[in-house]
């Protein structure tokens, strides 16, 4: 048997974001005797050691914010010239994939995959304009197109959206099965009473996730539901701003900031509702995980309806009226719904990671035949 095909994944870093979580879920479940993952990153990440343990290699170049446009393009060019033995480059950088794949094409790498994980760029006017310029290279530079949802495909690939394939953000379903024992243990660890109403959110502290609105919702809820808590999992540039807002509203004892955690499957057991008021998303892995644990989800109507696993757990709400969210939270909290769901529901929707990994295994092998 020959050596495995080495696929180069391109990301900013391998931290616990949605795209990165999907990549690691794939890596753990793919047939590594046939396919190995290497990574081109710009910064250290929490998954780096696991990648090395699984047999992957990590390459590093400075990101565009560290040296500017021309320095970044030069580094990409030099990297791909020195590493043109790769047969497959799989870029997860949304619009910025244009620069990555253009350099890979010039270096003669035959298979160049653009993967869309979002439906909108972050940043101000200048940043978005620059990203549009970067993204304009994708159509000429990519050979294959993948997306987490139809909306994500239309946003990044435009005219090529119909040529794209959907790669569903699968999860390890057994890990997220509800456990009352785990629920009680986590609540005890967090200092939360058994009979409290617990709202949860998992995501980076950035503009996209709309944490400020989430705090406003909880502030209103607290006025009518005194035994309620909000648990925030994640980190990011806006965390200190949100912490300051929590202090101003005197909610410190009721809002818990947990930072980046590796035990999301356990934390979800402690929640009563999952609240997700994002301005935009591709198709969040964390919402699949929440539904996998039987958790009712109130989410922004800006998020694609493709995220609903048809288990009667998801409700879409507008993000211009906090009172609507409070009313829905109170209504759901009065229901005694079972958290025990059938894994078949996720399986039938195609969100079992074993299916996703099998699809990618065949996809990569087909590319190099």
Predicted segments with their positions:
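Short hydrophobic beta-strand element within catalytic cores of glycosyltransferases
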Residues: 40-41, 296-300, 306
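Donor nucleotide-sugar binding/catalytic pocket of nucleotide-sugar-dependent glycosyltransferases
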Residues: 59, 140-181
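N-terminal strand-loop element at the rim of the active site
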Residues: 2-74, 79, 237-239, 363
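Aromatic "clamp/platform" in nucleotide-sugar-dependent glycosyltransferases that forms part
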Residues: 260, 279
């Amino acid at each position: 048997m020959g050596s495995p095909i080495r696929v180069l994944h391109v990301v900013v870093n391998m931290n616990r974001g949605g795209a990165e979580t999907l990549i690691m879920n794939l890596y753990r479940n793919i047939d590594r005797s046939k396919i190995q993952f290497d990574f081109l990153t710009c910064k250290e990440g929490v998954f780096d050691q696991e990648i090395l343990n699984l047999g992957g290699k990590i390459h590093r170049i400075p990101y565009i914010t560290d040296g500017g446009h021309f320095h970044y393009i030069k580094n990409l060019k030099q990297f791909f010239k020195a590493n043109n033995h790769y047969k497959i480059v799989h870029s997860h950088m949304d619009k910025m994939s244009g620069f990555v794949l253009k350099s890979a094409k010039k270096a003669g790498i035959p298979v160049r995959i653009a993967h869309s994980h979002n439906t909108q760029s972050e940043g101000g006017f200048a940043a978005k304009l620059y990203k549009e310029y970067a993204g304009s290279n994708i159509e000429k530079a990519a050979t294959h197109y993948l997306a987490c949802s139809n909306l994500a495909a239309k946003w990044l690939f435009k005219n090529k959206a119909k040529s794209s394939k959907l790669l569903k953000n699968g999860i390890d379903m057994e890990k997220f099965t509800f456990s009352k024992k785990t629920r009680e243990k986590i609540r005890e660890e967090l200092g939360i009473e058994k009979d409290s109403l617990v709202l949860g959110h998992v995501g980076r502290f950035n503009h996209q996730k709309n944490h400020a609105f989430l705090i406003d919702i909880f502030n209103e809820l607290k006025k009518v539901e005194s035994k309620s808590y909000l648990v925030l999992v994640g980190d990011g540039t806006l965390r200190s701003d949100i912490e300051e807002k929590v202090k101003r509203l005197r909610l410190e004892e009721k809002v818990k900031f947990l930072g980046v955690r590796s035990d999301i499957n356990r934390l979800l057991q402690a929640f009563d509702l999952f609240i997700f008021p994002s301005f935009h998303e591709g198709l969040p892995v964390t919402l699949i995980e929440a539904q996998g644990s039987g958790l009712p989800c109130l989410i922004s109507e800006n998020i694609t309806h493709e995220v609903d696993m048809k288990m009667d757990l998801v409700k879409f709400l507008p993000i211009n009226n906090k009172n609507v969210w409070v009313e829905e939270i109170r209504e759901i909290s009065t229901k005694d719904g079972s958290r025990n769901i059938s894994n078949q529901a996720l399986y039938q929707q195609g969100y079992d990671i074993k299916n996703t990994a099998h699809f990618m295994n065949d996809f990569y092998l087909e590319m190099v035949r």
